[in-house]
Amino acid sequence: MSNFHNEHVMQFYRNNLKTKGVFGRQ
């Protein structure tokens, strides 16, 4: 359970970074 939660958070964090990068370039 803890491992699955960790993976989910990392995926969400990576998506967040990607979105922030796109918005930052605009």
UniProtKB/Swiss-Prot annotation:
Which InterPro entries would you find in this protein's record? Stp
Q: Which GO terms describe its biological process?
A: regulation of viral process; symbiont-mediated evasion of host restriction-modification system; symbiont-mediated suppression of host innate immune response
- Glycosyltransferase as a keyword of this entry, yes or no, is no
KW Metal-binding (keyword) present: no
Which molecular function GO terms apply here? nuclease activity
- Superkingdom of source: Viruses
- Which controlled-vocabulary keywords does the entry list? Host-virus interaction, Inhibition of host innate immune response by virus, Restriction-modification system evasion by virus, Viral immunoevasion
Print the domain comment field: The conserved N-proximal 18 residue region of Stp is critical both for its anti-DNA restriction and ACNase activating functions.
According to its UniProt entry, what is the function of this protein?
Plays a role in the inactivation of several host DNA restriction systems including EcoprrI or EcoR124I. As a consequence, it activates the host anticodon nuclease PrrC. However, the phage-encoded RNA repair enzymes normally offset the damage.
Name of protein: T4 Suppressor of prr
Native organism is: Enterobacteria phage T4
